[in-house]
């Protein structure tokens, strides 16, 4: 039902400020989930199970982190047919993020620019929201560091968040690739990443012993990486036996949107312009890690064929964000069906 109405809703939403529209949509989805009206949103998406990270996904098309930073609309989002939901990024303490305006549409390029800055209500409220959700599918919880935590102490924030979210997560994503937190991408450097992942894997094992279950870790990386950086990241993922990698986050490049309104705004660019760069990182990363570290492909998926291209590049699963905002829930079903056809062809 919601899929057929979305084009009308989008016309109204796109007349609003981008962030106001975002919050309005989340509030509506959250209310639908809390009141049981989510069943009215339910999309008819076929099952297409895949097992990745030791988890069985209802279908391989997920929601990327960033849409629901506080986990406040999990049930409403789950009704739209996603095979898995990822919420966050959450930080140890609440923080407002960067000053508004901080989200911009580039409709001519089917893109967004955001410099949100990990705005969220903190991990304690996040955990309460996750616990209140009725959704029992695969749920990824995405964690980051507070803006005022020195980069040299970033590991402390990740370790704290990991401990808090661990009992409630199907998997936990380590976000070190947002361009909107100062110096965060430094953690993708070989030495910094090695130290961070060593600490996280040690914590993961101790939490697994405590809770009697091993919750997989996924690392989210940027598209703005050269060949040597991709190789170093691949080597580090293999060495620490990280369970998955999400490729990719938003880009700082503006090559594909030069001259468009808002193109010069600071922040990360997402949507169609990042599609090729994301696929290139996926291909190069897959050449390094093979099937030992499953890749979750995200960036610029606007059609079923786009989703298939991500898998052809080496991804095991895909996630939607900007394409979902532009095309709505119909994109989820289209991607699942396209991938299912590929497997049966």
From Swiss-Prot:
It catalyses: (S)-dihydroorotate + a quinone = orotate + a quinol. InterPro entries: Aldolase_TIM, DHO_dehydrogenase, Dihydroorotate_DH_1_2, Dihydroorotate_DH_2, Dihydroorotate_DH_cat, Dihydroorotate_DH_CS. GO terms for biological process: 'de novo' pyrimidine nucleobase biosynthetic process; 'de novo' UMP biosynthetic process. Substrate binds at residues 69, 114-118, 175, 180, 249-250. Pfam families: DHO_dh. Disulfide bonds: none annotated. It is a peripheral membrane protein. The keyword Transferase does not apply. It comes from the Bacteria. It is found in: Cell membrane. The active site is at residue 178. FMN binds at residues 65-69, 89, 142, 175, 220, 248, 271, 300, 321-322. GO terms for molecular function: dihydroorotate dehydrogenase (quinone) activity. Its EC number is 1.3.5.2. GO terms for cellular component: cytoplasm; plasma membrane. It is an enzyme of class 1 (oxidoreductase). Pathway: Pyrimidine metabolism; UMP biosynthesis via de novo pathway; orotate from (S)-dihydroorotate (quinone route): step 1/1. Gene3D superfamilies: Aldolase class I. Keywords: Cell membrane, Flavoprotein, FMN, Membrane, Oxidoreductase, Pyrimidine biosynthesis. Its main location: membrane. The keyword Metal-binding does not apply. Monomer. PANTHER family: DIHYDROOROTATE DEHYDROGENASE (QUINONE), MITOCHONDRIAL (PTHR48109:SF4), DIHYDROOROTATE DEHYDROGENASE (QUINONE), MITOCHONDRIAL-RELATED (PTHR48109). Belongs to the dihydroorotate dehydrogenase family. Type 2 subfamily. This is Dihydroorotate dehydrogenase (quinone). It comes from Burkholderia cenocepacia (strain ATCC BAA-245 / DSM 16553 / LMG 16656 / NCTC 13227 / J2315 / CF5610).
């Amino acid at each position: 039902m919601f899929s057929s109405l979305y084009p009308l809703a989008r016309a109204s939403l796109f007349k609003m400020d981008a962030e106001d529209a975002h919050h309005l949509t989340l509030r509506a989805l959250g209310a639908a989930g809390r009141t049981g009206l989510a069943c009215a949103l339910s999309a008819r998406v076929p099952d297409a199970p895949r097992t990745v990270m030791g988890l069985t996904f209802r279908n391989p098309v997920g929601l990327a982190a960033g849409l629901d930073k506080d986990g406040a609309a999990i049930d409403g989002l789950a009704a739209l047919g996603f095979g898995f939901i990822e919420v966050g990024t959450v930080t140890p303490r609440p923080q407002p993020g960067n000053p508004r305006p901080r989200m911009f549409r580039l409709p001519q390029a089917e893109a967004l620019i955001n410099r949100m800055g990990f705005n969220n209500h903190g991990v304690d409220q996040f955990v309460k929201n996750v616990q209140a959700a009725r959704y029992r599918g695969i749920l990824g919880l995405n964690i980051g560091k507070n803006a005022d935590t020195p980069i040299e102490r970033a590991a402390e924030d990740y370790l704290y968040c990991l401990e808090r979210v661990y009992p409630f997560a199907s998997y936990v994503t380590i976000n070190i690739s947002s361009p909107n937190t100062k110096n965060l991408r430094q953690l993708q450097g070989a030495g910094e990443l090695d130290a961070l992942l060593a600490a996280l894997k040690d914590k993961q094992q101790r939490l697994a012993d405590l809770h009697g279950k091993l919750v997989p870790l996924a690392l989210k990386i940027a598209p703005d990486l050269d060949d040597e950086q991709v190789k170093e990241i691949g080597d580090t993922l293999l060495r620490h036996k990280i369970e998955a990698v999400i490729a990719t986050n938003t880009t700082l490049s503006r090559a594909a949107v030069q001259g468009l309104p808002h193109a010069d705004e600071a922040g990360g660019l997402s949507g169609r312009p990042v599609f090729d760069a994301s696929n290139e990182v996926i291909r190069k990363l897959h050449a390094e890690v093979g099937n030992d570290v499953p890749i979750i492909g995200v960036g610029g998926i606007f059609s079923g064929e786009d989703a298939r291209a991500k898998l052809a590049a080496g991804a095991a699963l895909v996630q939607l964000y900007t394409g979902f905002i532009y095309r709505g829930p119909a994109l989820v079903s289209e991607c699942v069906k396209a991938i299912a056809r590929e497997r049966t062809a």
